[in-house]
């Protein structure tokens, strides 16, 4: 009996050990799996928390940028109230070095100014009319409607040549601006091009769209029949210099070279002779060389132009021909400005640019558009 019992226990002992080992391994696997799942959930939660924090900090930075825009607008209005001339020596032209927000709040007596210690701001104001406005390439006349401005196109050709670029890029750029303006007419309006056939075709298309709207049946809610027909071929309207990449011949390298000297504003504008660089001034005056423009700017830095007559008198010293300054292209004040703001709040960094219009009569300002600055 003892021999038989001993043999049976010896046989059961390995099975019990194997069962305990399997249970231990299973427990370890379950524990490991649970730890992995929990760590994954915690990691996802941490990522979500960080994402929400980043969104909150970015939103706060954007709110600070709005304050910077309002502050700059106040400076622009104050400057216009004091002097009807826009020149580079004004308070508006002084850039803001990286400064803590708390420093500004403390100076004006804001309570709890120390809360802005983690927020830094910098930026400046740029005279948008110190550059060549590509919108000048197209003008509008009651008799002919929208058409390419040949004088502005020649100015752009000279600017391209002064910058070491091909002047052949000017005609396609002018044509592209014209095409985008003609295609950006809103619903219910017709582009008066001056061509009877074109206007009749536009009127017929408008009537067809009206019939489609009256039927109430459409596969594209919110879009007219004309929109559906042209949405794939309609060029994108220019709002930024980088949009020139859609024009044949304008490579990123060409655009990078052009960027400091050109801009795109909602309407044709004059060049401010008090703020424009020598390349822009020389391009706008066919008989003026780049060297002469640089010499003229040297005298301008000593005393700004008070009006076009003053600029004409001083310009005559640097020109061999009796070319006059056309008020269509030149002025000594500015109505459009770009406000650049860079806000650093905690981990968030926001770069924004606002285009501001200043009324020449009331000096009131309003923001035309705000966009993120392109790096």
Regions found by a protein language model. Give the residues of each.
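Compositionally biased linear targeting/interaction segments
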Residues: 3-12, 22-32, 36-375
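Sec/Tat signal peptide C-region and signal peptidase I cleavage site
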Residues: 17-20
């Amino acid at each position: 009996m003892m021999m038989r019992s001993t043999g049976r226990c010896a046989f059961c002992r390995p099975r019990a050990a194997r069962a305990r080992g399997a249970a231990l391994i299973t427990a370890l696997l379950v524990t490991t799996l649970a730890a992995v799942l929990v760590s994954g959930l915690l990691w996802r939660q941490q990522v979500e928390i960080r994402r929400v924090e980043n969104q909150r900090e970015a939103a706060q930075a954007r709110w600070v940028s709005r304050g910077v825009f309002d502050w700059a607008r106040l400076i622009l209005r104050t400057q216009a109230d004091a002097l009807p001339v826009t020149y580079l020596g004004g308070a508006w032209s002084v850039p803001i070095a990286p400064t803590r927000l708390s420093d500004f709040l403390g100076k004006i007596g804001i309570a709890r100014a120390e809360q802005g210690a983690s927020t830094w701001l910098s930026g400046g104001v740029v005279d948008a009319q110190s550059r060549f406005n590509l919108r000048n390439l197209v003008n509008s006349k009651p008799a002919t409607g929208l058409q390419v401005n040949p004088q502005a196109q020649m100015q752009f050709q000279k600017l391209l040549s002064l910058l070491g670029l091909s002047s052949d890029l000017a005609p396609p750029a002018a044509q592209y601006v014209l095409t985008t303006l003609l295609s950006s007419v809103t619903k219910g309006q017709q582009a008066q091009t001056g061509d009877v056939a074109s206007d009749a075709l536009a009127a017929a298309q408008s009537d067809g769209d009206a019939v489609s709207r009256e039927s109430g049946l459409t596969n594209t809610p919110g879009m007219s029949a004309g929109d559906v027909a042209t949405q794939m071929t309609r060029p994108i309207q220019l709002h930024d210099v980088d949009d020139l990449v859609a024009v044949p011949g304008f490579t990123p390298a060409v655009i990078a070279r052009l960027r400091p000297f050109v801009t795109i504003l909602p309407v044709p504008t004059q060049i401010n002779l008090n703020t424009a660089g020598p390349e822009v001034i020389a391009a706008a005056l066919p008989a003026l060389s780049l060297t002469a423009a640089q010499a003229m700017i040297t005298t301008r830095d000593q005393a700004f132009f008070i009006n076009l007559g003053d600029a004409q008198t001083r310009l005559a010293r640097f020109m061999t021909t009796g070319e006059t300054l056309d008020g269509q292209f030149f002025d000594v004040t500015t109505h459009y400005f770009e406000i650049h703001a860079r806000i650093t709040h905690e981990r968030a960094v926001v770069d924004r640019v606002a285009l501001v219009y200043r009324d020449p009569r009331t000096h009131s300002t309003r923001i035309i558009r705000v966009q993120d600055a392109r790096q």
